[in-house]
């Protein structure tokens, strides 16, 4: 991947900040399941990401990169404040988290594994809209719009994932995340399953979407070239 990210606006608001965030998994022993220690998957992570900014998260396998991102999104339990758009979401009930979910999205490494083979592109991309109560007619129009934005022909929306190439499937996964116009998107190795030419295209697309919509990215990768092309700042996680 080549190029560099767009500069972040001087007045860009903070989207997410953490202070000494921890994810510790208990080690239990015996019949009473007594806790005898902890696996410290993430220990004292302090970070901040502003609108239109990308934080690259690098580290070897098992260093806690994805665990950190899932904790920020409140998809796994953690300790320590997580401020999202000025609000501490750490103690929020799932009912109170639900309205915030549309502002936090994720794009996974394997586009084929994350797309249901039994659903059409329209159904896949519109899934979030349906959850948040958008009507069918509006959903189809919004799917057409976002498919165009990610470089796919809206006439393809009635097809199934197996009819697309790996790069096209990743564009579908990106469209699914972006259709809700989120403030924060976690990109979990989104280019690692793609060949070099397609990687460059996907990085260009992600940069373009960020520039247009001032999205904050948490970009997880082990590929430093791609990290440099997309990230404004980088944290390194170690075992």
Regions found by a protein language model. Give the residues of each.
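ABC ATPase NBD coupling module
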Residues: 31-36, 89-105, 131, 136
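Conserved ABC transporter NBD signature motif
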Residues: 80-88
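Conserved ABC ATPase "signature" region
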Residues: 88, 137-155
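Conserved ABC ATPase signature
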Residues: 160-164, 168
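Hydrophobic anchor residue at the start of the ABC signature
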Residues: 174, 202
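A short, proline-enriched helix->beta-strand linker immediately N-terminal to the Walker B motif
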Residues: 179-183
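A short, surface-exposed alpha-helical micro-motif characterized by mixed small hydrophobic
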Residues: 227-229
């Amino acid at each position: 991947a080549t190029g560099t990210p767009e500069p972040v606006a001087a007045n860009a608001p903070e989207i997410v900040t953490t202070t000494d965030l921890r994810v510790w998994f208990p080690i239990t022993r015996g019949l009473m399941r007594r806790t005898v220690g902890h696996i410290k998957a993430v220990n004292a992570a302090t970070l901040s990401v502003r609108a239109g900014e990308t934080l690259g998260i690098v580290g070897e396998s098992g260093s806690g990169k994805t665990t950190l991102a899932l904790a920020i999104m409140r998809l796994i339990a953690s300790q320590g404040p997580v401020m999202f758009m000025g609000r501490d979401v750490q103690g929020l009930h799932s009912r109170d988290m639900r309205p915030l979910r549309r502002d936090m999205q994720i794009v996974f490494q394997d586009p084929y594994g994350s797309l249901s083979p039994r659903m059409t592109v329209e159904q896949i991309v519109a899934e979030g809209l349906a959850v948040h109560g958008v009507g069918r007619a509006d959903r189809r129009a919004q799917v057409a719009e976002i498919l165009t934005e990610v470089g796919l022909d809206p006439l393809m929306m009635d097809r199934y994932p197996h009819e697309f190439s790996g790069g096209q499937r990743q564009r579908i996964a990106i469209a699914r995340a972006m259709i809700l116009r989120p403030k924060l998107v976690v990109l979990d190795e989104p280019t690692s399953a793609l060949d070099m030419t397609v990687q460059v295209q996907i990085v260009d697309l992600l940069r373009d979407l960020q520039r247009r919509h001032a999205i904050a990215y948490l970009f997880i990768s082990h590929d430093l070239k791609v990290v440099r092309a997309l990230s404004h700042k980088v944290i390194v996680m170690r075992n």
